[in-house]
């Protein structure tokens, strides 16, 4: 018989840098999960990813206080900022342009995000990432 699910906890945690301080500690503490056990498991799973990159994680907490977790790919906006070499997006994306990004870079990001995106093909996913780039004030070059 399957374990009874008590809760799903969604967090964004920096890769390889999970520790019991907020947001991890309070979110898992109120579910009764062993926080250090999660931190060690998460850090071990994300040690191959660039340190500090925010990684979305969905933690399934069971009634017996055990847990499993699934890591996702970093948010598209974070990958776009990294590729364009900018600190933040534009405050007024229609008026201000903060950087440029090539179509090849967009396709590379779409390939990275392919596991988490529900697109029909890589072109559709690339267009989705392109929309995110434009909304951040990035100019897409061919």
From Swiss-Prot:
One or more lysine residues are methylated. The keyword Thylakoid does not apply. PROSITE patterns: RIBOSOMAL_L11 (PS00359). Pfam families: Ribosomal_L11 (PF00298), Ribosomal_L11_N (PF03946). SUPFAM superfamilies: Ribosomal L11/L12e N-terminal domain, Ribosomal protein L11, C-terminal domain. InterPro entries: Ribosomal_uL11, Ribosomal_uL11_bac-typ, Ribosomal_uL11_C, Ribosomal_uL11_C_sf, Ribosomal_uL11_CS, Ribosomal_uL11_N, Ribosomal_uL11_N_sf. One of its GO terms (biological process) is translation. One of its GO terms (cellular component) is cytosolic large ribosomal subunit. GO terms for molecular function: large ribosomal subunit rRNA binding; structural constituent of ribosome. Keywords: Methylation, Ribonucleoprotein, Ribosomal protein, RNA-binding, rRNA-binding. Part of the ribosomal stalk of the 50S ribosomal subunit. Interacts with L10 and the large rRNA to form the base of the stalk. L10 forms an elongated spine to which L12 dimers bind in a sequential fashion forming a multimeric L10(L12)X complex. Forms part of the ribosomal stalk which helps the ribosome interact with GTP-bound translation factors. Belongs to the universal ribosomal protein uL11 family. This is Large ribosomal subunit protein uL11. It comes from Shigella boydii serotype 4 (strain Sb227).
């Amino acid at each position: 018989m399957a374990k009874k699910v008590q809760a799903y906890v969604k967090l964004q945690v920096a890769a390889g840098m999970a520790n019991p301080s907020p947001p991890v500690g309070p979110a898992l503490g109120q579910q009764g999960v062993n926080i250090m056990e999660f931190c060690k498991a998460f850090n071990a799973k994300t040690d191959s990813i660039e340190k500090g990159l925010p990684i979305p994680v969905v933690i399934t907490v069971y009634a017996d206080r055990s847990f499993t977790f699934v890591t996702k790919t970093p948010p598209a906006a974070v990958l776009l900022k990294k590729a364009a070499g900018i600190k933040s997006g534009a405050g007024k994306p229609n008026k201000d342009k903060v950087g440029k990004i090539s179509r090849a870079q967009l396709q590379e990001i779409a390939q990275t995000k392919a596991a988490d995106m529900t697109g029909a093909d890589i072109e559709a996913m690339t267009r989705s990432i392109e929309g995110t780039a434009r909304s951040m004030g990035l100019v897409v070059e061919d």
